[in-house]
């Protein structure tokens, strides 16, 4: 068991300060009727509300790809909220780990480059 302060927080081993929440990057591939229905803008809006950083783009196969970085709890909430995007008909969401990527913000890209 690690040492905790009175607030139950565990100090960072490097600086002695309290550590920031763990960051994780995931890749989310969404298939179904997800292009030309406002899906990328919906995802950008959700990301903004949850302070998630990353990018979303259409893929040539008709799916939408999102790369998202945040703490794991917020990423889980983000994934569950994607299903509520209006006009989209989601057939499948495939989630995989992605190398940790630090984004300045969350952007909509036209296509994968």
Residue ranges of predicted features:
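Intrinsically disordered, low-complexity, mixed-charge
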Residues: 2-113
């Amino acid at each position: 068991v690690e040492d905790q302060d009175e607030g139950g927080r565990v100090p960072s081993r490097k600086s002695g300060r309290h550590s920031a929440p763990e960051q994780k990057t995931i890749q989310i591939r969404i298939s179904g009727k997800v292009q030309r229905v406002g899906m990328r803008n919906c995802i950008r809006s959700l990301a903004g509300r949850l302070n998630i950083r990353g990018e979303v783009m259409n893929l040539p196969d008709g799916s939408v790809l999102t790369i998202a970085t945040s703490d794991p709890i917020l990423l889980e909430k983000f994934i569950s909220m994607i299903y509520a995007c209006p006009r989209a008909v989601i057939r499948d969401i495939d989630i995989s780990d992605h190398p940790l990527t630090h984004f300045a913000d969350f952007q909509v890209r036209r296509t994968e480059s």
